[in-house]
Swiss-Prot record:
Complex and partners: F-type ATPases have 2 components, F(1) - the catalytic core - and F(0) - the membrane proton channel. F(1) has five subunits: alpha(3), beta(3), gamma(1), delta(1), epsilon(1). F(0) has three main subunits: a(1), b(2) and c(10-14). The alpha and beta chains form an alternating ring which encloses part of the gamma chain. F(1) is attached to F(0) by a central stalk formed by the gamma and epsilon chains, while a peripheral stalk is formed by the delta and b chains.
GO terms for cellular component: plasma membrane; proton-transporting ATP synthase complex
Gene source species: Nitrosomonas eutropha (strain DSM 101675 / C91 / Nm57)
Gene3D superfamilies assigned to the protein according to its UniProt record, in alphabetical order: 6.10.250.1580
Keywords from the named record: ATP synthesis, Cell inner membrane, Cell membrane, CF(0), Hydrogen ion transport, Ion transport, Membrane, Transmembrane, Transmembrane helix, Transport
InterPro entries: ATP_synth_B-like_membr_sf (IPR028987), ATP_synth_b/b'su_bac/chlpt (IPR002146), ATP_synth_F0_bsu_bac (IPR005864), ATP_synthase_B_chain (IPR050059)
Protein name per UniProt: ATP synthase subunit b
Coiled coil ranges: none
Membrane topology listed for this record: Single-pass membrane protein
Length: 157
C-alpha cells in the first residue's frame, strides 16, 4: 500500500464529510444558533424595557406621592380655614345672641321700672286721696272726682 493512495482516499473521504456537513448539518446548526441568539437578544431587550418601565413607574409613583402630599396639605389648610371660619361665625352668633338677650333684659327692666312707677303713682294718688279725706274729715268719692285724681296723677308723672 502506498502512502499517497491512503492520503488521497482520506482526503476524499474528508471532503465528502465536509460537503455532507455543510449541505445537511450546518444549516440546522446555524438556524438553531440564530434562534438562540434572537431569543437572547429578545430577552435582553425585554430586560431593558422592564428596567425602563420600572424607572418610569418609580418616577410616576414619586410624582403621585408628591401630588398626594400636596393635596393632603391643601385639604388640611382648607380644613383649618373652615374651622377658623366656623369658630368666628360661632363667636359672631354668640355676640349677636348675647346682644339680643341683653336688649331683652334691658327692655324687661324698663318695663318693670315703668310698672313699678305706675304702681307707686297709683299708691301715692290713693294716699293723697286718703290724706285729703282725713284733712277734710269727710270721704272723697273717687268716682265723682276721677278727673281730679287723673290730673293729680298726671302731675305726678
Amino acid at each position: 500500500m502506498n502512502i499517497n493512495f491512503t492520503l488521497v482516499s482520506q482526503a476524499i473521504a474528508f471532503s465528502i464529510f465536509i460537503w455532507f456537513t455543510t449541505k445537511f448539518v450546518w444549516p440546522y446548526l446555524l438556524r438553531a444558533i440564530e434562534e438562540r441568539q434572537q431569543k437572547i437578544a429578545d430577552g435582553l431587550a425585554a430586560g431593558e424595557r422592564g428596567k425602563k418601565e420600572l424607572e418610569l413607574a418609580s418616577q410616576r409613583s414619586s410624582e403621585v406621592l408628591k401630588e398626594a402630599k400636596q393635596r393632603a396639605g391643601e385639604i388640611v389648610i382648607q380644613a383649618e380655614k373652615r374651622a377658623s371660619d366656623i369658630i368666628e361665625e360661632a363667636k359672631k352668633n354668640a355676640r349677636v345672641e348675647g346682644e339680643k338677650i341683653l336688649a331683652g333684659a334691658k327692655a324687661e327692666i324698663q318695663h318693670e321700672i315703668f310698672s313699678a312707677r305706675e304702681s307707686l303713682r297709683q299708691q301715692v294718688a290713693g294716699l293723697a286721696v286718703q290724706g285729703a279725706s282725713k284733712i277734710l274729715r269727710r270721704e272723697v268719692n273717687a268716682k265723682a272726682h276721677a278727673d281730679l285724681l287723673a290730673s293729680i296723677e298726671t302731675e305726678l308723672k
